[in-house]
Amino acid sequence: RNYIVENVSQSGEVPATGYVPSGVYDAEGANGDDFRTVGGEYYSVSADDYQANCDKARELLAEAGYPNGEGFPAVEYMYNTDDRHKAIAEALQNMWQTELGVTVNLSNQDWNVFLKSRKDGDFQIARNGWIADYNDPCSFLDMWYTGGGNNDAQYSNPEYDALIDAAKATSDQTE
């Protein structure tokens, strides 16, 4: 992620360390802290951890029966027609193929076709860039809520949904 923001997009982005990015308020709103500061980082983007993350990914592939990516089916990475999205797709394709031995086929689509493919769930991996509709963690966390309007991945987990429902129903930050 550091490589992408420093060498590919080069627009001053902060590498993502979780589903909710930096700059989003915590439960106390504008008077509180940054959600990422309070909630901590889900994923380390430090350069020191990059190799360890690659090693862990290779280990998991081997455990699943795909040592060095051998026999792993090709993955399709879909993105909309945009030079920035293309550059990121090509960087990820190179990383996954080099580090994991996983073949990644790139597929670009015009914006309206891309939106329909995502909404229909007709993709394996789809690149998306998005900013929150409002400054609240749920603007991002709702992307994984069953039946949510932005849940293009069609993810569904009753436990996750219950946690989101509980978070929305309380103003007690300790809960």
Q: Language-model features: where?
A:
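Structural transition elements
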Residues: 14-63, 82-86
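Extracytoplasmic/peripheral linker and loop segments enriched in polar/acidic and small residues
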Residues: 5-6, 45-51, 102-114, 119, ...
